[in-house]
């Protein structure tokens, strides 16, 4: 019965979209899992004639399993040497060759006729610029504070592969870093291991990649300074409808059911600014100051300063608007 249901789902996806690319570049949204990426994808997908591919390398999903391109998380790692295959798969998706990978017909922002795509991807950190060039895409890189991101996650499926990666040890880490990382991996708490995973998943992008033509967006600025940030998105990505993006900012993501009860309670608050501030700061009541300090010790181990102790928004160089820090400091 399950197989039959999956087959019907694949059939509906295959028949539910006609895609012909015209003009503007497709958007490749890279982010860490539970960092607001579904919400961000839906904000971008609110635009006319857009469709989306939601985690086309997530091996837990039946359509990804059916595609058969990858079967294990390690195949997304640089050590596997599968880069050309993975990029070719993205190119095939651009050409609508795996039609069963299309969005489900009854999901939010589904459209029968489309001409532009947003891809949401939680891996391929080492291939972002190759994806940009090979797929002629625009890169959006979404950041969220490592503590709430980690607290929202239940598993870190690629952490073991990161720690064992010869590619990372050779290109991005020295012996002292590798030794300390292994100590945390083997003897740290789940929280510390989650921060470790966040650092690995963002290290290349924040320290080593050529990012001059990427668009960095932080979850906190998009939420707290929504209108200005949506206008920045529209300008940089050639998006015509700022109004639909602003509306999407205030609409919970389709995966809201994965959120904890405290988040669901916050979303019921009718005061928009109070609600947004609570979403950005609620994690501070869930950890000790010692844990927060330990988080930033791990970031320092990787040479990362994008977020700092006792500050809820990213470093100024990752923000687009001067008043975001002031907004973040004003409790509603």
Write out the residue ranges for each language-model feature:
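Short His-Asn-centered micro-motif
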Residues: 30-32, 119-122, 143-144, 219-220
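PAPS-dependent sulfotransferases, especially Golgi type II membrane carbohydrate sulfotransferases
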Residues: 1-27, 178-192, 199-202, 206-212, ...
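Glycine-rich phosphate-binding loop used to anchor ATP phosphates in small-molecule kinases
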Residues: 99-127
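PAPS-dependent sulfotransferase catalytic core
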Residues: 1-103, 159, 331
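Conserved phosphate-donor/acceptor-positioning beta-strand/loop module used by diverse small-molecule
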Residues: 120-121, 134-154
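Long, charge-dense
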Residues: 159-183
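PAPS/PAP-binding and catalytic site of the sulfotransferase fold
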Residues: 36-50, 131-134, 153-154, 216-241, ...
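Hydrophobic/aromatic beta-strand patches that form the interior of the parallel beta-sheet core
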Residues: 27, 51, 138-141, 215-217
